[in-house]
Amino acid sequence: MTQLKGILPALVTPFDKAGNVNYDMLGNIIEFQLKAGVTGFVPLGSTGEYYALTNQERRQILSTVREVVGDRGVLIAGANGSCTREVIEQVKQTRDAGYTNLLIAPPYYALPSQDELIGHYQAILDAAPDINVVLYNYPVRTNVEVGFTVLDAFKDNKRVIAIKESSGNLLRAIEIGNTYKDNYQLSCGSDDQALDFFLWGASSWICGPANCLTQQVCDFYSKYTSGDLN
């Protein structure tokens, strides 16, 4: 199973003044973050503005990230959309680009029930049997929570490997860390609660500030893992 550990930047997508993706700058950002000590990357997430990109731009971003990173870090790509069919198309496109670990949020706008959300994730797993899923709970953006009913449904599925928890509800994160510690890797998605997440069992931080405070974030994690909490 892929291990999510340490600082995983939620990669920004750099644009030039004309609104085109600046792939050279993307490569420079990745190299800078690797030198600072990050352990992997998450392209095409919320911070990467996947919703503002064409499919061709998404494919090129995936290719650029994979080419630059190589075997120097874990890669988890966002693959999201407003309905199950669209997400499956994004999943297959992402898989074809060489990614096997995908960050998948609930479909936005449709507001599925928890049972429908279980069906959504199961359809994705069935359509792409060679990928792993990182659940993405960000209800302020999707208006749908990846609830405990969903976590219960997939807790024994070895291909649903983790959850990025971005609700901002620390008590929920603590409950996930306690109740599902043997089922899911917990990744912090609430940047202002990173230390709390690590103290309560998170193994990684999918981190927006790593795009602008890279060394500080990596130093924070290094001090935490060495026991220096001062």
Language model feature labels by segment:
Residues L125-A127, R141-N230:
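Catalytic alpha/beta core domains of metabolic enzymes, predominantly
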Residues T2-E145:
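Active-site beta->alpha loop and helix N-cap motifs at the rims of alpha/beta catalytic domains
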